[in-house]
Amino acid sequence: MKHIDKIISHLVNNPEAFDQFKNGNLTLLNINEKEKKAILYAFEQGEVPRTSKWPPIEAISNFFEDDKRKSLI
């Protein structure tokens, strides 16, 4: 999950990177399609604020504890 935490943190702080992420190559990020869907779901549901004031890494990992979200990864 550490790599997902880092990706989310990077996307939150770089709006241009988010657009590239939605349309880009996943192999460079070391994630699979399901992980990409889970991250996009987080943004679409408003769970990830588009600001640099994101909570600690633990909060990001906790996001994926929800059953519906777990099913995405």
From Swiss-Prot:
Main location as per UniProt: secreted
InterPro entries in the cross-refs: Competence_ComX_Bacillus
Disulfide bonds: none
Lipidation (3'-farnesyl-2',N2-cyclotryptophan): W54
Subcellular location: Secreted
Residues of the propeptide: 1-52, 59-73
PTM (free text): Trp-54 is modified by farnesylation, which is essential for activity. Modified by the tryptophan prenyltransferase ComQ before export to the extracellular environment.
Keyword Ribosomal protein included in the entry's annotation: no
GO molecular function terms attached to this record: pheromone activity
Subunit text: Interacts directly with the sensor histidine kinase ComP and stimulates its activity.
Protein purpose: Part of a major quorum-sensing system that regulates the development of genetic competence. Acts through the activation of the two-component regulatory system ComP/ComA composed of a sensor histidine kinase, ComP, and a response regulator, ComA. Activates the expression of the genes for biosynthesis of poly-gamma-glutamic acid (gamma-PGA), which is involved in biofilm formation in B.subtilis natto.
Protein name, as recorded: ComX pheromone
Name of the encoding gene: comX
